[in-house]
């Protein structure tokens, strides 16, 4: 009753179908709002424009496009889920000034400094899943968890930190080498072409095609994993880059040189022409002591 005759501002079109909750548009009509200001239409084809039409039909004035770009930015994960049928994908890597991510022997701890690593945990806290390749899993035995305090995350001390689902891409040859990933009751998803035994908290997704990455991403979204952070090594990062399967790229660059014998981070096949290359849009630069963090959006997406 308090909103009767009021102006309502929303960043996304009010829903017009019943899913987990009743349609928002029906509630706005019921309580007789005066006008709706909407940032963007819902990209879901079942809703797109339908909620606005229902409001107009009920005699409610509507305005679409207020702060449109900001609203798209705010809802970028949802938009990607709806339009691409996959999670919003962030690629993350720490590199030297000469673009290396590890020494020849595989040593990579630590290229980035503690402040950069702390920042990367903030990114982990914003996604639904963290993905690494099987080689990285077996070589580094990572925990793939958010290791920050409630205070550092801006949470109340009694709030529970939501840990992302742990995701492994590829066949695991030495499961004993990944004990930290499988520790505790964390959910783990493994996507590969190989077979594996079923386990309590582990789901194995088996694929027939060699290039199953896109199908794997769709299956992750089907499991309500709406966003993932890819922290893989060269092979995994390049797989996503080659398939143009990413929305955001985060690079932490440390002030050091590791030399030509060290392992490259991004090493994809060169395009025949410059205009055929994957274009990025820089959206942010941050400094963590001597490390530089640069964040990019994929322009093609």
Predicted feature locations:
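Residues at the N-termini of beta-strands
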Residues: 35, 129, 227, 247-248
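Active-site ligand-binding patch in enzyme domains
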Residues: 80-81, 86, 90-227, 235-238
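Short gly/pro/ser/thr-enriched loop/turn and capping motifs at secondary-structure boundaries
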Residues: 43-46, 138, 174-176, 255-260
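Zn2+-dependent cytidine deaminase-like catalytic core
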Residues: 1-71, 241
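Conserved histidine-centered catalytic loops in small-molecule metabolism enzymes
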Residues: 269-301
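Flexible, gly/pro- and Lys/Arg-enriched active-site loops
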Residues: 241-280
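Hydrophobic/aromatic beta-strand patches that form the interior of the parallel beta-sheet core
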Residues: 9, 37, 63, 167, ...
């Amino acid at each position: 009753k308090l909103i009767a005759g009021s102006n309502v501002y929303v960043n996304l079109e009010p829903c017009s179908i019943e899913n987990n909750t009743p349609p928002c548009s029906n509630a706005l009509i019921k309580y007789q709002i005066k006008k709706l200001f909407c940032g963007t239409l819902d990209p879901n084809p079942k809703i797109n424009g339908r909620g606005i039409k229902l409001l107009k039909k009920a005699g409610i004035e509507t305005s679409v496009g207020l702060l449109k770009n900001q609203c798209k930015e705010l809802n970028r994960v949802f938009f990607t889920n709806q339009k691409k049928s996959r999670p919003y994908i962030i690629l993350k890597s720490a590199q030297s000034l000469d673009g290396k991510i590890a020494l020849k022997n595989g040593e990579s701890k630590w290229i980035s400094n503690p402040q950069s690593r702390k920042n990367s945990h903030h990114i982990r806290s914003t996604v639904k899943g963290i993905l690494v390749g099987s080689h990285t899993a077996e070589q580094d035995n990572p925990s793939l968890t958010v290791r920050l305090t409630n205070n550092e995350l801006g949470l109340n001390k009694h709030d529970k930190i939501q840990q992302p689902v742990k995701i492994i891409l590829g066949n695991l040859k030495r499961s004993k080498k990944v004990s930290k990933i499988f520790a505790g009751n964390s959910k783990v998803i493994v996507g590969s072409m190989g077979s594996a035994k079923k386990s309590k908290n582990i789901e194995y997704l088996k694929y027939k095609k060699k290039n199953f990455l896109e199908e794997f991403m769709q299956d992750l979204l089907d499991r309500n994993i709406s966003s993932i952070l890819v922290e893989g090594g060269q092979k995994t990062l390049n797989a996503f880059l080659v398939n143009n399967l990413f929305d955001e790229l985060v690079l932490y660059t440390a002030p050091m040189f590791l030399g030509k014998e060290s392992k490259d981070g991004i090493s994809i096949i060169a395009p025949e022409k410059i205009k055929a290359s994957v274009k990025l849009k820089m959206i942010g630069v941050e400094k963590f002591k001597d490390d530089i963090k640069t964040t990019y959006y994929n322009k093609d997406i």
